[in-house]
């Protein structure tokens, strides 16, 4: 069968359009792209490597390389579409400067922290790592080692890292970079519902009458979901979109209710909406009386800075997440002070706009989806913002039904599936278990076949605290995988770089390319990427997706999972576990951590025969058993029967993912609702079963100011973020020629009047300066981002312009998530 280029392109367009419309796909269109008889290309499915949307792509390989990708028509998430980054997935692994062998800083053949990077073998790399880890463990104990992972870790990577750190090394100093992006969402879910992750799903988009974006530029950060929102808005009369942000961006192009507000004032707007609902008698009293409790939150909780910082010293209740019961009438009185006039004064938004927004929520006939990402979460009161938007949905009963959903969008491909569900945070274990709960630790120890008391009960150091402890010499052995924290962390010159270069510390970075972080490391380990290994991600709608390895990694690059497992062989329990633990459990004496953690009868349970025929799998072939299946099935034990049920491993390779809980082979679209969620009891209607009484909580939480605001010297707000062309720090996308050319350099976006008043013109070189640092960049007064007077926006993908030299390392005191959206700067001509 021969197909012309014209017919090929036409068929592909027909297929995508048909899938987007939800109609059947012509056979010729559905098969033409992946018909290997035409191209000699082998096609397999995998989730996209980039954001948390969880698009599925078809990956084409030929002669051992990924040569093409296209949107997976069979995927219910993206329906054959890709964003601009997704279209160039095939190129992310083939940058000219790909790392292919371990590199150690050396002088005259020996390790030297100030030496030059020199190639070494994997054995040599693990030898020096083990030497440094053992020295640190012996001298200072497990709290002096740490690991910083990622929401881009596969499920297997994160799970193995958690076992190695929390059970093997008995240290809870394990964190993902998702601390920077999703931690406030997590704590918000836990406080309100007692269980993590959204109750709704993407199907809500096709059922909603209104969409409200709180600090979310979906058109650039979640473009495939935005196509679905756009389709709903343009094809169904009466559907409305409201976009709230501190500056105008591309999502405003579709906004019926555009709102630009003063940074931090979203707290006041949210409380006003609750007040509006109550004063206009729009509370769903039947729902709230049956399914809601009210509590007053502790206030004046500080800003997550170092204890000696004046703002921390001044806080009355630093880091407190406590709350006390209150009645509906008391809650009504609390929000009554948030009148439209007060909210307008604090936010700078005209009263009529605020009322128009509030009416979307108040009207019982309007089904509303609230979307948010970093604008809410990267916020010194991010947890409160999450709680307050839930207040609105709970007051109106607009929750857990099709088209009614408060929906926290995820930034990374497995911030949900790995960081949150696997539990790679310093306080967590899988399936919402926590290290501070003795019963939870016992569950983990039983599943992992470990002695009672193996897992420590003390919460480890969170991401920002890890950087501070490295600087202060309290963490001395540190392993970083799948992130670029020296570019991505806040206040990097003062709080991050000093710890990496502290002569008492040994820093290991597993990376695919040279980055700002790897340049500051002592040892760099070359890492396999994406489909160079078998993997699994979990997206924002609780959809777990797995993929097979499709190509080999270049040179000596190895999967992160292999690195973790192989490193565990270098330690015996006698070297890392306390004597009393081993004396009471002598069967564990003399065993390696590899034996204890990965040859435990669970992980090594499945033979190589279980591998799909013709499938590559470097780790499994190396170890002689199906590593990934064993890890997955052991991990799944945590959630089955506890509201986090995963399907059997093989089922995921037969589908485009499943949304948990998966019970009796059926996924769950809407949690907490009878008839949709198998955990809701018959007759309950709704049941928020993460709480002991099955009721969600509405919190009374006030507006409180930002940690740092503009003043006479530093007279402008700075907000940072991303652009559609680049992923996070740009270490992958800047190596794709088409994406680099589309957006090669960062700029400072500012209002034309602000530029004019400073004698600046578009294209001028300027310094963006804060109390902490400065960068040189160029002025942009046009284009996609249009800040109001008094605010500037700088994207952070550009390693030549490290804007996080400038940002403040203030965090939400409850979630420990950094606020990258608000600090004070000045702009001066360079």
Curated annotation (Swiss-Prot):
Protein modification: Predicted to be exported by the Tat system. The position of the signal peptide cleavage has not been experimentally proven.
Signal peptide segment: 1-31
Subunit field text: Component of the periplasmic nitrate reductase NapAB complex composed of NapA and NapB.
GO annotation, biological process: cellular respiration; Mo-molybdopterin cofactor biosynthetic process; nitrate assimilation
Domain called 4Fe-4S Mo/W bis-MGD-type: residue spans: 41-97
Any GO MF annotation of the entry: molybdopterin cofactor binding
Annotated InterPro entries: Asp_de-COase-like_dom_sf, CT_Nitrate-R-NapA-like, MoPterin_dinucl-bd_dom, Mopterin_OxRdtase, Mopterin_OxRdtase_4Fe-4S_dom, MopterinOxRdtase_cofactor_BS, Periplasm_NO3_reductase_lsu, Prok_molybdopt-oxidoreductase
Gene3D superfamilies recorded: 2.40.40.20, 3.30.200.210, 3.40.50.740, Dimethylsulfoxide Reductase, domain 2
Main subcellular location of this protein, as a coarse class: periplasm
Residues bound to substrate: 796
Oxidoreductase found in the keyword field: yes
EC supergroup of this enzyme: oxidoreductase
Binding site for Mo-bis(molybdopterin guanine dinucleotide): 85, 152, 177, 181, 245-249, 264-266, 374, 378, 484, 510-511, 533, 560, 720-729, 804, 821
Function, as annotated: Catalytic subunit of the periplasmic nitrate reductase complex NapAB. Receives electrons from NapB and catalyzes the reduction of nitrate to nitrite.
Catalytic activity: 2 Fe(II)-[cytochrome] + nitrate + 2 H(+) = 2 Fe(III)-[cytochrome] + nitrite + H2O
Any single Gene Ontology cellular-component annotation: periplasmic space
Cofactor note: Binds 1 [4Fe-4S] cluster.
Keyword line: 4Fe-4S, Electron transport, Iron, Iron-sulfur, Metal-binding, Molybdenum, Nitrate assimilation, Oxidoreductase, Periplasm, Signal, Transport
HAMAP family hit by this protein: Nitrate_reduct_NapA
Chain positions recorded as [4Fe-4S] cluster binding sites: 48, 51, 55, 83
PANTHER family linked: PERIPLASMIC NITRATE REDUCTASE, RESPIRATORY NITRATE REDUCTASE
Family: Belongs to the prokaryotic molybdopterin-containing oxidoreductase family. NasA/NapA/NarB subfamily.
Cofactors demanded by this protein: [4Fe-4S] cluster; Mo-bis(molybdopterin guanine dinucleotide)
Documented EC number(s): 1.9.6.1
Protein name according to UniProt: Periplasmic nitrate reductase 2
């Amino acid at each position: 069968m021969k197909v012309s280029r014209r017919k090929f392109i036409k068929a592909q367009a027909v297929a995508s359009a048909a899938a987007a419309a939800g109609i059947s796909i012509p056979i010729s269109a559905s098969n033409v792209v992946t018909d290997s008889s035409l191209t000699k290309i082998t096609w397999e499915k995998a989730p996209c490597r980039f954001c948390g949307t969880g698009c599925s792509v078809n990956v084409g390989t030929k002669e051992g390389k990924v040569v093409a990708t296209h949107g997976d028509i069979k995927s219910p998430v993206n329906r054959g579409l890709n964003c601009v980054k997704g279209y160039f997935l095939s190129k992310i692994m083939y940058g000219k400067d790909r790392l292919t062998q371990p590199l150690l800083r050396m002088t005259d053949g020996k390790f030297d922290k100030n030496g030059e990077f020199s190639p070494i073998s994997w054995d040599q790399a693990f030898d020096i790592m083990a030497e440094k880890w053992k020295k640190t463990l012996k001298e200072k104990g497990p709290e002096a080692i740490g690991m910083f992972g990622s929401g881009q870790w596969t499920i297997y990577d994160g799970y193995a890292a958690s076992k190695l750190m929390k059970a093997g090394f008995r240290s809870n100093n394990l964190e993902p970079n998702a601390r920077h992006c999703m931690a406030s969402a997590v704590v918000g879910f836990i406080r309100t519902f007692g269980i993590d992750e959204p109750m709704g799903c993407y199907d809500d988009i096709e059922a909603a009458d209104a969409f409200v974006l709180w600090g979310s530029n979906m058109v650039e950060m979640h473009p495939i979901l935005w196509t679905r929102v756009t389709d709903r808005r343009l094809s169904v009369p009466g559907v409305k979109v409201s976009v709230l942000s501190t500056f105008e961006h591309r999502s405003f192009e579709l906004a019926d209710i555009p709102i630009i507000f003063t940074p931090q004032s979203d707290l006041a707007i949210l409380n006003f909406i609750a007040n509006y609902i109550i004063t206009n008698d729009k509370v769903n009293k039947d729902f709230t009386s049956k399914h809601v409790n009210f509590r007053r939150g502790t206030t004046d909780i500080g800003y997550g800075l170092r204890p000696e910082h004046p703002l921390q010293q001044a806080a009355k209740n630093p880091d407190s997440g406590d709350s006390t019961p209150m009645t509906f009438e008391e809650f009504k009185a609390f929000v009554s002070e948030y009148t439209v006039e007060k909210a307008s004064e604090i936010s700078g938004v005209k009263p009529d706009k605020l009322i128009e927004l509030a009416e979307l929520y108040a009207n019982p006939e309007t089904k509303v989806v609230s979307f948010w990402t970093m604008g809410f979460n990267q916020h010194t009161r991010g947890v409160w913002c999450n709680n307050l938007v839930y207040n609105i949905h709970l007051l109106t009963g607009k929750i857990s039904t099709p088209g009614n959903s408060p929906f926290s969008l995820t930034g990374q491909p497995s911030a949900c599936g790995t960081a949150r569900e696997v539990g790679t945070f310093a306080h967590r274990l899988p399936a919402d278990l926590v290290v501070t709960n003795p019963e939870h630790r016992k569950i983990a120890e039983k599943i992992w076949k470990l002695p009672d008391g193996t897992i420590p009960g003390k919460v480890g150091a969170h991401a920002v605290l890890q950087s501070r402890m490295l600087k202060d010499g309290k963490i001395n052995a540190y392993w970083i995988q799948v992130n670029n924290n020296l570019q991505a962390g806040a206040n990097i010159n003062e709080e991050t770089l000093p710890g990496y270069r502290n002569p008492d510390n040994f820093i290991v970075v597993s990376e695919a390319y040279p980055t700002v972080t790897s340049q500051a490391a002592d040892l760099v380990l070359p890492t396999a990427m994406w489909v160079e290994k078998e993997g699994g991600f979990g997206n924002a709608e609780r959809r777990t997706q797995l993929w097979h390895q499709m190509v080999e990694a270049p040179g000596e690059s190895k999967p992160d999972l292999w690195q973790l497992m192989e490193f565990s062989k270098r330690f015996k329990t006698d070297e890392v576990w306390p004597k009393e633990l081993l004396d009471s459990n002598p069967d564990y004496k003399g065993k390696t951590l590899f034996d204890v953690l990965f040859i435990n009868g669970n992980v090594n349970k499945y033979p190589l025969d279980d591998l799909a025929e013709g499938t590559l799998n470097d780790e499994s072939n190396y170890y002689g058993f199906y590593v990934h299946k064993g890890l997955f099935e052991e991990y799944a034990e945590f959630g089955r029967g506890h509201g986090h049920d995963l399907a059997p491993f093989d089922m995921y390779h037969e589908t485009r993912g499943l949304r948990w809980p998966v019970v009796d082979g059926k996924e769950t679209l809407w949690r907490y609702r009878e008839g949709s969620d198998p955990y809701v009891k018959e007759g309950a209607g709704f049941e928020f079963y993460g709480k002991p009484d099955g009721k969600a909580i509405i919190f009374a939480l006030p507006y409180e100011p930002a940690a740092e605001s503009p003043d006479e010297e530093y007279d402008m707000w700075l907000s940072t973020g991303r652009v559609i062309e680049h992923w996070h720090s740009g270490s992958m996308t800047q190596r794709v020629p088409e994406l680099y050319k589309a957006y090669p350099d960062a700029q400072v976006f500012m209002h034309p009047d602000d530029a004019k008043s400073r004698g600046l013109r578009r294209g001028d070189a300027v310094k963006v300066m804060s109390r902490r640092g400065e960068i040189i960049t160029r002025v942009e007064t046009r284009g996609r981002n249009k800040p109001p007077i008094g605010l500037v926006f700088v994207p952070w993908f550009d390693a030549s312009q490290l804007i996080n030299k400038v940002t403040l390392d203030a965090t939400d005191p409850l979630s420990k998530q950094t606020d990258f959206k608000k600090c004070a700067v000045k702009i001066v001509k360079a």
